[in-house]
UniProtKB/Swiss-Prot annotation:
Keywords from the named record: Cytoplasm, DNA damage, DNA recombination, DNA repair, DNA-binding
A biological process term (GO) from this entry: DNA recombination
Protein name: Holliday junction branch migration complex subunit RuvA
Region (Domain III), start-end ranges: 144-198
Lineage: Bacteria, Bacillati, Mycoplasmatota, Mycoplasmoidales, Metamycoplasmataceae
Chain intervals for the UniProt region annotation (Flexible linker): 140-144
Chief place where the protein resides: cytoplasm
Length: 198
């Protein structure tokens, strides 16, 4: 089993990337792809899924992220695609929520139902609470709460979830809710996003 490769990202389309290492191109699936840029040299940790339903190689920015992916797919009812979707929410955010036992916040992840969220917390909280400091967990959770407040406010104004997520991915996260709302609305307006009642 190949644990990692060092190379360069030569193409990126959504979560699908082409990663060149030692003259060989690898087709990989990378959660939260906004973290990497084309032509960026980096080390990616790999995990290959090969069965009758799927043949794919997932890539991760660090070993702990890969470890969480493996932990997630070991749980009953959570497959590779579901685990990928969870990590796409943001590795640090997910770890902080698991460490705090915050199943309610985990439910905000698209396609993650309450039963799965409670299962993740029940099975993984003890392990992952030891792998993140309380200070870091509190800081990440504060940012997550701010983003949730901004999202809910923008939904009430009439923007779609997809519009909001797209705008928030392009602005800096701060503890100033009003400023983030103003920046998000400005961005969506200038880029001619189509607004509609949620």
């Amino acid at each position: 089993m190949i644990l990692y490769r060092i190379g360069e990202i030569i193409h990126k389309h959504n979560s699908n990337i082409i990663f060149e290492s030692q003259g060989i191109g690898y087709s990989l699936i990378l959660p939260d792809p906004e973290r990497v840029e084309i032509k960026q040299k980096c080390k990616l940790y790999l995990f290959e899924i090969k069965n009758e339903y799927q043949y794919a190689t997932y890539a991760f920015k660090d070993f702990k992220e890969r470890l969480l992916f493996v932990d997630l797919i070991s749980l009953n009812g959570i497959g590779p695609r579901a685990a990928f979707n969870i990590l796409n929410f943001g590795f640090e955010k997910v770890v902080a929520l698991i460490a705090e036992g915050n199943a309610e916040a985990l439910i905000e992840i698209p396609y993650l139902n309450p039963r799965m969220a409670r299962l993740i917390v029940a099975e993984l909280q003890a392990k992952w609470s030891k792998m993140i400091s309380p200070k870091d967990a509190a800081k990440i959770n504060e940012t997550t709460n701010t983003l949730s407040e901004v999202k809910e406010t923008l939904k009430m104004v009439g923007f779609k979830t997809k519009q909001i997520d797209g705008a928030l991915s392009k602005i800096s996260s701060t503890d100033d809710v009003e400023k983030m709302i103003e920046e998000a609305i400005k961005l969506m307006s200038t880029q001619n996003y189509e607004s509609a009642t949620a």
